Structures are given as C-alpha cells and as structure tokens.
Amino acid sequence: ICVPTPMNDDGSCDTSAVEEVISLCTCPLIILRSTVRVGFTKEMTNKYNKKIVFQPEYFGETVAHPFADLSDRSWLSFGGKQDAIDMAIEVYQSVINSNVKIYQADSDTVEMAKYMENAYLATKVIFCNEIFDICEKLGISYNRAREIWIADPRIGSSHTFVYKNERGYGGSCLPKDISSIVNQAKTVGIEPKLLEAVINKNMDYK
C-alpha cells in the first residue's frame, strides 16, 4: 500500500486513505509503504486482524534520487510482528540482491526511523540555507565553503545545495513528515523546539 498521507490542519498525519485500503485488502500479507504516524501499523494489525508489515518507501521526488530504483538500495527495514516480517522478507528476497542489509524491528521503531530521516533532512536543508545567508553577508562563496565542508565524510553531500529561487525545503514528504513528528511529540508532552524552529524558518523562506 502506497497512498498519500497528507498533513491535517494541526500538523498530524491523515491516514484515512491508508486505513480504507487496509480495510478492503483480502490478501494474506499487506506491505505498507506510506509514511504513517508511530503506532499506526500496530493499531491496524490489531483492529483488522491482518498481517501488516511497515516497509517504508524511499523513492524520493527527483530523477537523481539515490534510491530511485530498488536495485540501488543497500538496506531495507521491516517493522511488524515476526511471522509477518518473515513472510515479507521471503517475498523481497526473490527480487533483491543478497548483499542488501535487512533490518527488522517492531513497527513503532521502523515508523519512528522513517520520521527521523525526513525530519533530519529538513533540518539539514534549513541549516544549509542559514549558512548560505551568513556566507552572502560575509562575502563568502557558499559553494566553495560547502565543497570543503562535505569533504569530511561525516557530513554527507545530500540536501546541501541551496537554490536561490527555491529556498528551504518543499515537496510532498519533508513538510508533512516533520510537522507530523512535531504533532506526535506534543501529544506525549514533548516540546520539540528545534524541529519547530526548522518549520518556522522554512516558512520564512516561502
């Protein structure tokens, strides 16, 4: 299942389309690819008494995305009950390379890992945009500084370009996913000030 999970007005994740499809599925195993809030897969498994595995989608939105093809993936993560995960892995092993690293965990953990990825990438984009602004004021070439910076293998070059005519992050994934994890944090009494600052700064760029 890979259907949209748009952002609600309060920043939460709208999973109504996902649940509708789950309710209609009669297959022995459901692979859920859509990004959903933490706890959703477990909730649906119990509610509908179906075998559901969360195996997050990473295809991205550009033709240059490093994971645009399944054959480019070096790892896969599976979240759910063990019997369902075993069934899913058996299916995937018929199409993936034997050197692909497989990670298994409960669905809550894998759902959180997906949010961690997108929230971090959104934060990285805003960090680079702010550094770009500082470079501009100091008369420094951001791109030259960037090349030296990313030479450190700990940094990573993805999401470090800054586009003058399209500042901040956008698309259909990063905005809704960072908003969703902020919403989830607040529901359990956490004030995620860093992530909220990232969202607010991104709004300044729009």
What positions do the PLM features span?
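Structural/interface elements that position substrates and couple domains in central-metabolism enzymes
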Residues: I1-K206
